[in-house]
Amino acid sequence: MSASTTSLEEYQKTFLELGLECKALRFGSFKLNSGRQSPYFFNLSLFNSGKLLANLATAYATAIIQSELKFDVIFGPAYKGIPLAAIVCVKLAEIGGTKFQGIQYAFNRKKVKDHGEGGIIVGASLEDKRVLIIDDVMTAGTAINEAFEIISIAQGRVVGCIVALDRQEVIHESDPERTSATQSVSKRYNVPVLSIVSLTQVVQFMGNRLSPEQKSAIENYRKAYGI
């Protein structure tokens, strides 16, 4: 399940605090790929130092461990998912105990390689493996849908997905059921979609650090696009 409740654990607070420090999490006015004008922006690529990556890996790994999801391979869709799969695989082995020591990781090439080891999958074989997809955020679910297809062709079985932030917003504002990307993926493939934090938790964490104008902008955005 997604991190949709309002309670915050220490690893989530640390993740968000560091996100503010490195400006991965910002508030203002930002145009998204979807064309929406968002009052906040989340750019996980700004977790780009050793300290930040170590803490990011801890946040992902802790969320995974707490989910009790059983899997064999972490799959990172190219490109942003590649370093995430690697660092979280290491962190799981470090803090997760013996049952995570054998977890492997893999990722896809953007183009099929026709020489050397060939193929599109790099790293662990996905054949007959239970696969957890890892990515940064899920807005429309396009990258995740592509990952499902790649894994299926490689004869793996997706058992779940995890992202850093669940934006908790609809894919299409005209949708009468107000279905979010995470809900759509979960329903379509019958797998859990985990997250380190949800937008609800971000707002709770920020509290009075948000100005009245920022709070109002987020509230209006959620009325228009929230689930």
UniProtKB/Swiss-Prot annotation:
One term of GO molecular function: orotate phosphoribosyltransferase activity
UniProt KW Transferase keyword: yes
UniProt entry tagged with the keyword Transmembrane: no
Record-linked Pfam families: Pribosyltran
Reaction(s) catalysed (UniProt annotation): orotidine 5'-phosphate + diphosphate = orotate + 5-phospho-alpha-D-ribose 1-diphosphate
Record GO biological process: 'de novo' pyrimidine nucleobase biosynthetic process; 'de novo' UMP biosynthetic process; pyrimidine nucleotide biosynthetic process; pyrimidine ribonucleoside biosynthetic process
Binding locations of orotate: F41, F42, T139, R167
Binding-site residues, 5-phospho-alpha-D-ribose 1-diphosphate: 79-80, 109-110, 113, 115, 135-143
Signal peptide start and end residues: none
Pathway the protein contributes to: Pyrimidine metabolism; UMP biosynthesis via de novo pathway; UMP from orotate: step 1/2
Oligomer status and interactors: Homodimer.
Function (record text): Catalyzes the transfer of a ribosyl phosphate group from 5-phosphoribose 1-diphosphate to orotate, leading to the formation of orotidine monophosphate (OMP).
Misc. remarks from the entry: There are two genes coding for OPRT in yeast.
Name of the molecule in the record: Orotate phosphoribosyltransferase 2
Organism: Saccharomyces cerevisiae (strain ATCC 204508 / S288c) (Baker's yeast)
